[in-house]
Structure formats: structure tokens, C-alpha cells
Amino acid sequence: MENLMTSSTLPPLFADEDGSKESNDLATTGLNHPEVPYSSGATSSTNNPEFVEDLSQGQLLQSESSNAAEGNEQRHEDEQRSKRGGWSKGRKRKKPLRDSNAPKSPLTGYVRFMNERREQLRAKRPEVPFPEITRMLGNEWSKLPPEEKQRYLDEADRDKERYMKELEQYQKTEAYKVFSRKTQDRQKGKSHRQDAARQATHDHEKETEVKERSVFDIPIFTEEFLNHSKAREAELRQLRKSNMEFEERNAALQKHVESMRTAVEKLEVDVIQERSRNTVLQQHLETLRQVLTSSFASMPLPGSGETPTVDTIDSYMNRLHSIILANPQDNENFIATVREVVNRLDR
């Protein structure tokens, strides 16, 4: 008997499992006979096909329960994250309603001092940035003598009295009543939207929980389970197809971007060449203006007696051309002189 126990080996089903897994699997299959020797129990259990089938089903159920627990933990973390709230990135805060008909709010003594001294200090030291100016004015206010500081405080008190009187009169007008109704309607709409969003979130969480519960409640190896697997496989195929289409689109867009980048680089090279060409032409034009000015400096225009300068050479040449075309017979001598000057320029 001892030789049989020492020579017997565990079947492959238990060869790779540790002690804790063996105890869990045996508990799942319902083996409640601790007094039976281990070798004989293992041999008889592995020879029984019903035991192997029950063991595999128990392992599947255990893996499904662990997946369900992980899903519940993930859902709990998402709920906690949504409860923390916060202003989502990308959203814009709506500006509060502003009553344009309301009286102007009063200014404090410190604000009056800041408004008065800020422009003076900015005009005196324009290179100082705005935060530094504010800090300097704060130090100046703290060191201001009490009698000078009291002047700003008295002005603030008078402004506050003015505001209270105007506000009391404004609250009796129809414009204030209209603004109050708008504010109340906006608050009601805001609370209604918040309730609707909260209800939609709750419904979505409930629907997700029901779907997950319905998925985990499907018995394995049934027609419903097979249909569910087929639906998941069809969904995965559709997602793979969509993914391939998007990848093809991205590749085409990438090629288009590369071609556009090449075209832009070519245009930039052309722009640089045109700029250098314009620079050369501008230099040539300036040289020509100087030569014409020096050549025609001793030739005043008939009638006006105008002589050219570097700044007026363009208008001088236009008027010279008009005189030559208008009265060539009356200005033959002048035209002959112009021809001589031009001939010297060609040489």
C-alpha cells in the first residue's frame, strides 16, 4: 500500500495548481470526505467525467464572478469621480446678467487712489509692467499720511450715499422689475437644467447597471448565451471595419498634408527669390533717380522753372513728358537739350 502511494502521481488536472486552488476547486465540486486518503480521492475523482465537467463549470462561474466584481469596482470609481463635480474642461461659464440701467456702483477710497495715481505713474514710467505698478501703488497707499488718505475715504463715503439714494429710486422703476423677473426666470431655468442633467445621469447609470446585470445573468452554453456571443462578435467585426476605414482616411489625409507642406515650402522659396529681386530693382531705381536728378538739374521746366530733386524727380519727368508732347514746335531748343542729356545717359 505504501509503495502504491509513493509511486502514484497526481493527474495533469492538479499538477499546476497550488494548495489554495486545490482547496477551492474541491470545495466547488462538493467533495466533503476529508477522511478519505488523498491519493485514492484524487484518482477516483479524475476518473469520473462528471467531476471534471463540474470543476470546469465552477472555474467559469468563479471567473465570471471575479469579472463582475471588477466591473462593479470600476463603476463605483466612476460614480465617485462624477460626484466630485468640478467645471469640465472646454466649457464656458455664462456671464451673469448685468443691469445696464442700474446706478453705478460706488468706489472705495483705495480704488479711487489707485485710479488717480495709476495713470500718473504709467505716464512717468511706461516701462514698468502693470502688476509692478499695482504693487508700488499698494505700498504708496500704506505709507500715505492719514490726512491725505482721509480725503479719498470722504469721497468714497459721499459716493456711497449717492449710490444708495439712486438705488432706492431705481428700485421703484419699471426697469428694475423687468430685470428682477429676468433674473428669477434664469435661476428657474438653471435649476431645471441641473435637475434634468442629474436625472439623465441617474437613468444612464441605471441602464448600464441593468445591462451589465443582464449580461452576467446569462447561463453559459445556452442558446441565449450563443446569440449574445454572436452579437458581440458582429459588433467587433463592425468596429474593426470602421477602424480600418478611419486608418485609410488618416493615411490619405497624411499624404495630403505632406503635399501641402511641400507646396508651402516651394512658395516660401519663391517669395524669398522675389524679395531679393525686388531689392535689386529698388536699388537700380534709386540709382536711376540720382542720375536723372544730376543730369536734369540745370534744365528748369519751361513756364514753371522747376528743377528736379531726388524726391521730386518722378513728377518732374512726368511734366517734362507732357510739355514735349503738348507743344513740340514751341520748345524745339528745350527738346534738343533733353535729347543730348538722354544720349549722354545711354553712353
UniProtKB/Swiss-Prot annotation:
Amino acid composition bias (Low complexity), ranges on this chain: 55-66
Residue span of region Disordered: 1-113, 179-211
Alphabetical list of Pfam families matching this protein: HMG_box (PF00505)
Entries under Gene3D superfamilies matching the protein: High mobility group box domain (1.10.30.10)
PROSITE patterns: HMG_BOX_2
Top-rank taxon: Eukaryota
GO CC terms: nucleus
Tissues where the protein occurs: Ubiquitous.
Origin organism lineage: Eukaryota, Metazoa, Chordata, Craniata, Vertebrata
Biased composition (Basic residues): 83-96
Coiled-coil segments on the chain, per record: 229-273
Name the UniProt record assigns to this protein: High mobility group protein 20A
UniProt organism field: Homo sapiens
Principal subcellular localisation of the protein: nucleus
Subcellular location: Nucleus
One GO term (biological process): negative regulation of neuron differentiation
Gene Ontology MF term list: DNA binding; identical protein binding
DNA-binding region, residue intervals: 103-171
Gene that this polypeptide is encoded by: HMG20A
